[in-house]
C-alpha cells in the first residue's frame, strides 16, 4: 500500500536489542531533503477498547523514537534525512476465512519528537 503511495521500502520489523522494534522503515523522496519514514502498523478487530491510533500511547511513542535513534546510529547514511513518524491503521480486521481486506488509514506525522 505505501509503495503505491510513492514510498520506498527499506526495512521491516527492525529490532535493536531489548529497546524495541520498528514495524516499517520507508524512504520518501522529496524535492528538498529525502525523508526517512518510520511507520507503526496497528490493527484492531473492534473499537470497543479504542482505535488503533489510540493504542499508540506516549510511552509507545517514546519507545519508537528511542529505537529510531538506534536505527540511525546503525545506518549513518540517513543522518541528513528528515524523519517522520507515520501510522498505518487497520480497523475491523476480518476473522480468518473472511475474504474482505480492510482498507488501511495512513496517518502522516502521527506524532513528533518532543
Please state what every model-predicted region is.
Residues 1-13:
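Acidic-basic catalytic patches of nuclease active cores, encompassing PD-(D/E)XK
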Residues 15, 27-29, 90-92:
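A generic structural motif
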Residues 17-20:
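Short acidic/glycine-enriched loop/turn segments that link adjacent beta-strands
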Amino acid at each position: 500500500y505505501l509503495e503505491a503511495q510513492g514510498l520506498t521500502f527499506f526495512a521491516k520489523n527492525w529490532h535493536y536489542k531489548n529497546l524495541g522494534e520498528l514495524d516499517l522503515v520507508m524512504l520518501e523522496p522529496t524535492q528538498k531533503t529525502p525523508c526517512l519514514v518510520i511507520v507503526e502498523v496497528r490493527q484492531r478487530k473492534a473499537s470497543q477498547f479504542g482505535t488503533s491510533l489510540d493504542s499508540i500511547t506516549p510511552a509507545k511513542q517514546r519507545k519508537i523514537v528511542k529505537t529510531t535513534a538506534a536505527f540511525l546510529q546503525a545506518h549513518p547514511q540517513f543522518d541528513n534525512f528528515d524523519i517522520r513518524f507515520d501510522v498505518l491503521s487497520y480497523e475491523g480486521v476480518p476473522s480468518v476465512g473472511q475474504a474482505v481486506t480492510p482498507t488501511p488509514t495512513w496517518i502522516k506525522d502521527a506524532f513528533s519528537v518532543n
